[in-house]
Amino acid sequence: MSSQAFTSVHPNAATSDVNVTIDTFVAKLKRRQVQGSYAIALETLQLLMRFISAARWNHVNDLIEQIRDLGNSLEKAHPTAFSCGNVIRRILAVLRDEVEEDTMSTTVTSTSVAEPLISSMFNLLQKPEQPHQNRKNSSGSSSMKTKTDYRQVAIQGIKDLIDEIKNIDEGIQQIAIDLIHDHEILLTPTPDSKTVLKFLITARERSNRTFTVLVTEGFPNNTKNAHEFAKKLAQHNIETLVVPDSAVFALMSRVGKVIIGTKAVFVNGGTISSNSGVSSVCECAREFRTPVFAVAGLYKLSPLYPFDVEKFVEFGGSQRILPRMDPRKRLDTVNQITDYVPPENIDIYITNVGGFNPSFIYRIAWDNYKQIDVHLDKNKA
């Protein structure tokens, strides 16, 4: 999306430098040059901070619409980068809460001024004072400080969210000590998840417990990540085995827990994993009554509902599965990169604020988002 296209919507939205930054980030999202929910969320917040600092508006609703337009542009650039839209919705919720709080306080103040208490019979004979002049002066001073106040509220909300994301692993790692037992066999089908990696390392170092981790190779897209994941665990004296995807069913009877990483968590309790084949592993665990724990930070919680699952699942090139062939040979090859896991195949979500059942995820989502901001696109809202 060009800077001219974005500026035409709001010509005074930001300076040219910010528009160039927006175009650069949009291009990086389209080319998939930014990988991982963590990196995308932090870069989006840094961009949003620059955007709000340079934004111009007459009313706070104008600022909210500008932020929504920016979020819509980023979501269209990378529709499956859910953390990008999630953090923008979090800041919108902060602004809307502040607007609602200011509106309520203004209403209470005007009511108390307009309707003074009559304390004695003598006051009944007096002409009440007209507070219109005072209200005019107060509203004038309020309008003068509105821009500065809401700008600071949004920037402070962004800083708080950045701190939350950077320290999100600490809250999750505290649960690892109580969750993993000694001499237990664990299985993880998401070797590219840094949160799962820190989760297992923390359980080994802080509790000094001995356990074995089985890592599925994730052929064909994550085989290299699986071996690197196993190598990092072995460096912390954790016994690790890389197993073929086809051996999961045979090994599941020995597994005590399945731990998966997430890319996005929807309000129905379902999740998008960053590796294909995770859904089959969770389905197998359900048949063997093996508990499945999904590790996710709050910034991965999305207010969207997966009505069309195929729209949220990514597909890659077929060159990893089959070599290049004669185009005249009609053969359709599917290389699924991500996977959707339904809520019935997940037992507990482990977040930085505690563990929750999938059926309770919707309540946590609505504590952080507003219903009006579920769809940033005006045509869908």
From Swiss-Prot:
Secretion signal span: none
GO MF assignments: enzyme regulator activity; translation initiation factor activity
Keywords: Cytoplasm, Initiation factor, Protein biosynthesis, Translation regulation
InterPro entries found in the cross-reference section: eIF2B_beta_subunit, IF-2B-related, IF_2B-like_C, M1Pi_N, NagB/RpiA_transferase-like
Disulfide-bonded cysteines: none
Family statement drawn from the similarity comment of this UniProt entry: Belongs to the eIF-2B alpha/beta/delta subunits family.
Record's function text: Acts as a component of the translation initiation factor 2B (eIF2B) complex, which catalyzes the exchange of GDP for GTP on the eukaryotic initiation factor 2 (eIF2) complex gamma subunit. Its guanine nucleotide exchange factor activity is repressed when bound to eIF2 complex phosphorylated on the alpha subunit, thereby limiting the amount of methionyl-initiator methionine tRNA available to the ribosome and consequently global translation is repressed.
Protein name as annotated: Translation initiation factor eIF2B subunit beta
Primary gene name: GCD7
